[in-house]
């Protein structure tokens, strides 16, 4: 860019930019003669070359138009197939949804049935454990009461035989009533 600026600066300082009107000095006559000779001598060659070029261009355009028509035809066929595929996909979706509904309903019924069975089993197990714990607690309370009663009776009556017989008889009666 700097060189470009220097060229214009030199031209502006020295002579400036101008038009050379001397025909002999510029070589315009030589260029015109050369172009004339080329046209005269190369007319047949250039004409046939241009004709071949024109023919190849026309052929290329016709081929391109044929390919365009073929591509348009294939595009329309592909669009038809796409619309048919969309119809098939929507039918498959509808069938899938209805099948899901049927499966969910049957699964829900089976799950409800399984849940009811499991709940019944859990409830029976709970009641069985509750009854077992109740009996164990009852047995422990009876043993504790009997031990305390024996201890109090021994303190009250001492080691006498009659007291022992009375206590044993009372314990046997209580055991029979509680069990």
Swiss-Prot record:
HAMAP family assigned to the protein according to its UniProt record, in alphabetical order: ATP_synth_b_bprime (MF_01398)
The species this protein was found in: Trieres chinensis (Marine centric diatom)
Described purpose of this protein according to its UniProt entry: F(1)F(0) ATP synthase produces ATP from ADP in the presence of a proton or sodium gradient. F-type ATPases consist of two structural domains, F(1) containing the extramembraneous catalytic core and F(0) containing the membrane proton channel, linked together by a central stalk and a peripheral stalk. During catalysis, ATP synthesis in the catalytic domain of F(1) is coupled via a rotary mechanism of the central stalk subunits to proton translocation. Component of the F(0) channel, it forms part of the peripheral stalk, linking F(1) to F(0).
Bilayer disposition of the protein: Single-pass membrane protein
Additional comment: In plastids the F-type ATPase is also known as CF(1)CF(0).
This protein's record includes keyword Nucleotide-binding: yes
Record-stated family: Belongs to the ATPase B chain family.
Subcellular location: Plastid, Chloroplast thylakoid membrane
InterPro entries for this protein: ATP_synth_b/b'su_bac/chlpt (IPR002146)
Keywords, alphabetical: ATP synthesis, ATP-binding, CF(0), Chloroplast, Hydrogen ion transport, Ion transport, Membrane, Nucleotide-binding, Plastid, Thylakoid, Transmembrane, Transmembrane helix, Transport
Transmembrane segments: 28-46
Listed GO CC annotations: chloroplast thylakoid membrane; proton-transporting ATP synthase complex
GO MF term set: ATP binding; proton-transporting ATP synthase activity, rotational mechanism
Subunit structure as annotated in this protein's UniProt entry: F-type ATPases have 2 components, F(1) - the catalytic core - and F(0) - the membrane proton channel. F(1) has five subunits: alpha(3), beta(3), gamma(1), delta(1), epsilon(1). F(0) has four main subunits: a(1), b(1), b'(1) and c(10-14). The alpha and beta chains form an alternating ring which encloses part of the gamma chain. F(1) is attached to F(0) by a central stalk formed by the gamma and epsilon chains, while a peripheral stalk is formed by the delta, b and b' chains.
Domain of life: Eukaryota
Protein name per the record: ATP synthase subunit b, chloroplastic
């Amino acid at each position: 860019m700097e060189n470009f600026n220097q060229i214009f600066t030199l031209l502006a300082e020295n002579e400036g930019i101008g038009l050379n009107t001397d025909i002999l000095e510029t070589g315009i006559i030589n260029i015109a003669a050369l172009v004339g000779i080329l046209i005269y001598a190369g007319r047949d060659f250039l004409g046939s070359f241009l004709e071949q070029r024109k023919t190849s261009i026309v052929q290329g355009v016709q081929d391109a138009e044929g390919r365009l028509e073929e591509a348009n035809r294939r595009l329309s066929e592909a669009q038809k197939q796409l619309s048919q595929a969309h119809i098939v996909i929507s039918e498959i979706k509808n069938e899938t949804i209805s099948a899901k509904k049927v499966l969910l309903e049957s699964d829900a019924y089976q799950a409800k049935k399984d849940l009811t069975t499991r709940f019944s089993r859990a409830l029976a197990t709970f009641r069985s454990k509750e009854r077992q714990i109740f009996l164990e607690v009852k047995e422990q309370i009876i043993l504790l009461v009997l031990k305390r009663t024996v201890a109090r009776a021994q303190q009250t009556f001492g080691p006498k035989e009659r007291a022992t017989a009375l206590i044993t008889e009372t314990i046997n009666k209580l055991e029979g009533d509680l069990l």
